[in-house]
Amino acid sequence: MDMAGVSRVALPYLRFVVTACACGVGLVELGPTSKASEHFWVDLRGEARLAISDNSLLTIKDRTPDVVLNMSPGINVRWESKRVRGGIDYALDYLYFISDKSADYRHSGFATIDAEVIKDHLSLNGRASLRQQFLDQRGSITNSFANKTDNRRLIQNYTGSAILKGGLRDIADYRLTYRYGLARTPADNLDDLTLPVNFSDTNSSEFVASIGSGNRFNNFSWRISADSSRVMRSLNVNDFKNEHIAGELTYKFNRFIQIFGSTGYSRNNFQADVLSEDGRTWNAGFRWTPGRKLDLTVSTGKEGQREVWYAALQYFFSARLDFNGTYQDTLSSNTIVTNDSLQGFTFDAEQGISNQSGLPIDETDPIFTYSDVDFRRRNGRGTFTLRKKRTTFYATGNIEWRTFDDSTGTAVSWGISSGFDRNVTENTSIKGSVGYRQSRFEGQFRIDNYIEANLDWTTELSRYFRAAIGLSHSERQSNEAGADLEENAVTFYLRGTF
């Protein structure tokens, strides 16, 4: 491999490791001094996969079957102490396609770090992610790795935040939050004609400050807040800016119900009249908690010319079955959405990186095409989770409308999916999932229906070795001629941990 090839493979890894380690080293010095309270684990691993695909080039016609060999060294590092909890997982995949004897390298990694620097006052956290993702939802997409397409590229995301909070005796409390984000991709290279779409590298800054009533105020409380979000882009396109200042009053009738309302001022630099804001805003709603099982919040208001709604519902049917649902209406960008998603991920010793619902993260790609165009995001989702001794089952549904700031219209995507993870024996497990999604693209009459299904069987051969067999199916049915796509794959997998 020439030096350019070495740099292409090594640079994302180096950036990922340097960023994660910089956060980790800085936080190590701030952690507890008692060595007995610290725990550190390092697991090296090697993985070998043999995958058989019936459409390795993800083409509509003349599908090419292929056998793909995948060798993947990796490392997992975890660290826990009284004030710091962190994890890093990184793997470099080498893929060899037997049909044309070509090779490819792919990075994947995730890092989390959470630290309480000053107890009850100052906390820091960071997230880093390396993922291979499909850039254009109109292009070639699948849920299998055993293929190659120009639509799949490495996306790097890094976020770090600091939260400072405290109180002025029992009269007032304050909270300051700052979050910085970086997004790096090859898609800002306008000279690369193999890219299906172009969009910028970004630097983002998000700041929220609030001061409110303290413990002295029981039934009646107040809060004043201000926030600013900015995204700076590398290409010559419009940057994202959104700012608010507001005052809120809350009245608690009893321990079951409370009402709240706010008024303030907002402004942004959106171009479309329906999305542009420079004036007064208001919001009103209630929170209802009749018992330990139910927590419901609903609010409505107006920002600019937009009527906005917010809702959040959590209901515990039993200790094993619960439901979480949310709906929100915000102005956002791809960078802000990614930062929010990363911030909700945590490291679980048994499941690895988990999402806000405590489930393993969904490695499927974003449901909208990457772009530099900002948008109004109306998003609703709900998840049922059932946990038993050996089995976890989930069913989830979501819908999202995105109205773009370039007057191309509104894109809509909705989907449902379900899955399970069962420990058959102490050493053997099986998990599966099935999902359906429909996407209506902005500015077009194109409608895509996407179906995917996965089934994986895993067994531990010994303390250090694990074997697995996986089946996957991906299918896209579109009303646009020549856009249908299908792939089936079988994967044999062997993993050694050292």
Task: Label every PLM stretch briefly.
Residues G31-F498:
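Gram-negative and organellar
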Residues M1-H39:
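Cleavable N-terminal export/targeting peptides
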